[in-house]
Design a protein with these regions (language model features):
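C-terminal catalytic/acceptor-binding lobe
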Residues: 19, 154-243
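Short beta-strand-to-loop acidic/aromatic patch adjacent to the donor-nucleotide binding site
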Residues: 83-93
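N-proximal low-complexity "stem/linker" segments adjacent to membrane-targeting elements
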Residues: 1-22
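Short beta-strand-to-loop element that shapes/binds the nucleotide-sugar donor at the catalytic cleft/hinge
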Residues: 116-131
Length: 243
């Protein structure tokens, strides 16, 4: 059995965090080496509630000042001693078993798969920039390649729930020099990596109406290669969309 560390980032959304962890513990049937929860709200009341509810289940990391999501991830990944990480956010509800095993089967089929999205195609396609390749299978596990529509340059990396290889993380020098997932994705794309989405979804996005602003994430103004500037109509959606 491959050794995996669980890392979850959270920022003050206790109700969503509880739903996420309750569903994860209900459906996960894969033995994990270590479980970390890093909380970035810098709110002592939140810290106390999380400690009371989850202190016996996970190793809790409470930031002493707000660091933002990416910095929190970088600091937590320094503690990881396993080749694989199951990365998770605080606003996803798990709906079935074997999702970690299914991720592993898919990622083992091609070292250039950077991650496996566990949500449905309908959920991922709320912003109409994705297309999906033909159905592929590893054993009984189906998946499709995620493709950005012509001109769009991202779609290759996300902090959505799923397996990440520590070797892939180290390949680009970690995330410390990046301000957003878009630029991380562009870097992986240059190296020939791509993303896939599972055919049998295992999570539901429950965070749409509870977006948390993160001033440390600097979103580039570019969105579509060669397109004129001023995509203001999409800007609001892009900032709240999950990558």
């Amino acid at each position: 059995m491959k050794k995996i560390t669980f890392v979850l980032t959270s920022c003050g959304r206790i109700e969503l965090l509880n739903k996420t962890l309750e569903s994860f513990f209900k459906f996960n049937d894969y033995a994990l080496e270590k479980m970390y929860l890093v909380e970035d709200s810098f709110n002592q009341n939140v810290y106390s509630e999380i400690k009371k509810r989850w202190g016996k289940k996970l190793t809790l990391l409470f930031n002493e000042k707000k660091k933002g999501q990416i910095k929190s991830i970088v600091e937590t990944y320094k503690l990881v001693n396993t080749p694989l990480i199951f990365h998770c956010e605080d606003d996803w509800e798990y709906t079935r078993k074997n999702f970690i095993q299914d991720c592993l089967k898919i990622m083992d089929s091609d070292e250039k798969i950077i991650q496996v999205w566990l949500e449905s195609k309908e959920s991922a396609s709320r912003l109409d920039i994705f297309e999906y390749g033909p159905l592929q299978k590893v054993g009984n596990v189906g998946f499709r390649k995620v493709i950005c529509k012509e001109g769009w340059e991202w779609g290759y990396f996300s902090f959505r729930p799923g397996i990440k290889r520590l070797s892939d993380y180290k390949l680009i020098g970690g995330y410390d020099n990046f301000k957003n997932e878009l630029d991380i994705g562009v870097e992986y794309k240059k190296r020939g990596y791509y993303t896939v989405i599972i055919e049998n979804p295992a999570v539901i996005d429950i965070g749409d109406d509870h977006h948390v602003s993160d001033v440390t994430r600097k979103w580039p103004k570019r969105r579509k290669a060669g397109a004129p500037t001023g995509l203001k109509r999409l800007w609001k959606h892009l900032k709240s969309f999950k990558f």
